[in-house]
Amino acid sequence: MRGGPCGGYPRRMTAIPDSTVGTNTAVAGLESTFADELGALTVPWQGAHAPDPTLLVLNEQLAASLRLDVQTLRSEDGVGVLSGSTAPAGAKPVAMAYAGHQFGGYAPLLGDGRALLLGELTSSDGQRVDLHLKGSGPTPFSRGGDGFAVIGPMLREYLVSEAMYALGIPTTRALSVVATGQNVHRYGAEPGAVLARVAASHLRVGTFEYAVRQGEVLQPLADYAIARHYPELTELPPGRDGNRYLSFFEAVVEAQASLVAKWMLTGFVHGVMNTDNTTISGETIDYGPCAFLDAFDPAAVFSSIDHGGRYAFGNQPVVLKWNLARLAETLLTLFDSTPDDAITAVSAVLATFDERYDGHYAAGMAAKLGLAGELVDRALVDDLLTLLEEHGADWTGTFRALADELRGHSTPLDGLVPREHIGPWLERWRGDLTKHGRGAAETADAMDCVNPLYIPRNHQLDAALRAATDGRLAPFEKLLEVVTHPFDRRDEWSDYTTPAPPSFSKSFQTFCGT
């Protein structure tokens, strides 16, 4: 979240510094189409000076895909840009304005309280992406916060977003984390840091919630979003019959239904599914209070501020649909000539969310169970989930153990669910597997390709971030290596498959630190 706690209202600063043109060429090729075309949704701004910036981690593979020179990024000029101290030559850094529903309550103005959009780059595959800094200092949207961030949460977002990318889940990505050399007061004094984030864009449901109340900017915003994310829709009529904008809404519904299904299949708990954290692109964004399931529990909540369990693991599809309804409300004036027709049209599209989600989830679960290409028996899935919940079985470990079961190795599964309880279910599952005629070994190998062995286990990530805060990066670097190879079994990584001990899980909480 931006600017202090995860909620609250912003206050405007009284002065806005000039957006000066720098001479630093460490990040070349930045464009500013969002700021140029939608200036009403931005405030020109500069990052705060970092007194002693030190590069902690650099995503060299991502840098190369953005056609950025790695050695230049590691130079003094490069670190200056990545820390927010120096604006790249020709850049027009801005803080982005948006609103949002936070835990169901509407906040009319949120915005980048500790972040800056430096501009856009074109990747080697021709995709336009944002380069965004997080923790770069106060902005007009800081809401009384200091605008800074600390090492632990920035490294957390770096590692988890890269793990999600390796898992094949749409996500923003991390280019770097730079320590600023300045302490920030959170739970005592902690070392400050800035994350450089790369995203398909930073357009959110909350961006539209803000724009709809700003007069003429809504339609240009919708057209920009379509051109950027769903260009196949640009040829549709833009008139008030709603073809283009209704199709745009449908595309976002589809993208988000697919995304949340992937979360549910992976055991990912986002933790703060506010509308300002729901992207138009369908990417996962904001990893502040996120976590991963160990024991399967639909009611699992890890966020310290989610007292009512609104964003519990099992609630995520319902919440996502609710967020999409808020997007629909902002687009009504673009759909049809009468309010009733507009509501009817958008409601019909929103009503398809459940079927879309169910389809993505069923296909994903079929693959996890080795039934890819087959219609999965809903009762088979539901009964497995009941068994896992009743016995507190590890979500990630269960599906790898099922593959081992097909190979004749029963010990892993026996350690998760007693044989006398899961035995009848296994017979039904094996019966379904025989229908597609694939051998047991081949099926097990296929399952291993979609069921990760390594995820960012909560206790291991927590330990790595504590060590990094104390100046020891080695545990973080090792965990990063492991979770970015989630399907590759290596004997030396066996410790990384172990769920957290019950004593840890009982008290573990996440915080909205990013």
Curated annotation (Swiss-Prot):
Binding-site list for Mg(2+): 277, 286
GO molecular function terms listed in the Swiss-Prot or TrEMBL record: AMPylase activity; ATP binding; magnesium ion binding
Listed transmembrane segments: none
Keyword Manganese carried by entry: yes
EC class of the enzyme, as a word: transferase
Enzyme Commission no: 2.7.7.-, 2.7.7.108
Chain positions recorded as ATP binding sites: 111, 113-114, 134, 146-147, 197, 204, 286
InterPro entries: SelO
Catalysis: reaction(s): L-seryl-[protein] + ATP = 3-O-(5'-adenylyl)-L-seryl-[protein] + diphosphate; L-threonyl-[protein] + ATP = 3-O-(5'-adenylyl)-L-threonyl-[protein] + diphosphate; L-tyrosyl-[protein] + ATP = O-(5'-adenylyl)-L-tyrosyl-[protein] + diphosphate; L-histidyl-[protein] + UTP = N(tele)-(5'-uridylyl)-L-histidyl-[protein] + diphosphate
Function comment: Nucleotidyltransferase involved in the post-translational modification of proteins. It can catalyze the addition of adenosine monophosphate (AMP) or uridine monophosphate (UMP) to a protein, resulting in modifications known as AMPylation and UMPylation.
Family: Belongs to the SELO family.
Official protein name in the record: Protein nucleotidyltransferase YdiU
Organism: Rhodococcus jostii (strain RHA1)
Record gene name: ydiU
